[in-house]
Amino acid sequence: MNHIFRRSIPITARLPSLGIRSLATATASAHPPVQLYGLDGSYASSLYTAAVKESKLDNVEKALNKLSGVLQQRPEFEQYISSPWLTREDKKILVSSLTQMTGNEPLLKNFYNVLLDNHRLYLLTRIQKQFSTLMRAKRGEIEVKITSATPLDSKILSRLESRIAKSKYGKGKLLVSNKVTPSIIGGLIVEIGDNILDVSVGSRLNNLNKLLSEPI
């Protein structure tokens, strides 16, 4: 049978041999700060646990962020790593390239091998995003995305940030960004973590203030 059709190796069975313990056996200090869901969340959580135990959280985060930048600049490379038709030699070359891109970190090299063995390399971008979620939670950071039809000036962004910080949603360090989407006509979409507030520009900040003032 062609090796690409092999049965997937369970993550909890494969990771321990690489020094990556499952969440069930992780110590309290190494436990991820928030629970993630999905296969990408499971891999990100296992990588987080391993990085904590080896005191390599910052190194792994920087390396994955760097890799994410490369994949964004070279979409053809992301298509390649997602291909189910890679030969054994292709895989060796691929792991070597990924390892070099991320600073020759042994922990990540092992992790890439786990993904390859399980035919899950296509999850790499999503795993990076999930890992970033864990790191933001560890630092007590809250991502705030404000989508508008045109760029918002610094005064408006400051007012929004100030109001959110005083609301039930502002329990942490806010990381505010403004995304411009012309199709958002006459409105703002404010994403605070997992919460989404759709606010009409016609009433300016009144509706937003009302939403933010609601009791928890």
Curated annotation (Swiss-Prot):
Q: Which Pfam families match?
A: OSCP
Q: Domain of life, per the record?
A: Eukaryota
Q: Which InterPro entries match?
A: ATP_synth_OSCP/delta_N_sf, ATPase_OSCP/dsu
List the signal peptide residues.
none
What biological-process GO terms show up in the record? proton motive force-driven mitochondrial ATP synthesis
Extract one GO cellular component term from the record. proton-transporting ATP synthase complex
Major location (coarse): mitochondrion
Regarding protein family, the annotation reads: Belongs to the ATPase delta chain family.
The protein's matches in PANTHER family, at most eight in alphabetical order, are given as: ATP SYNTHASE DELTA CHAIN
Protein name per UniProt? ATP synthase subunit 5, mitochondrial
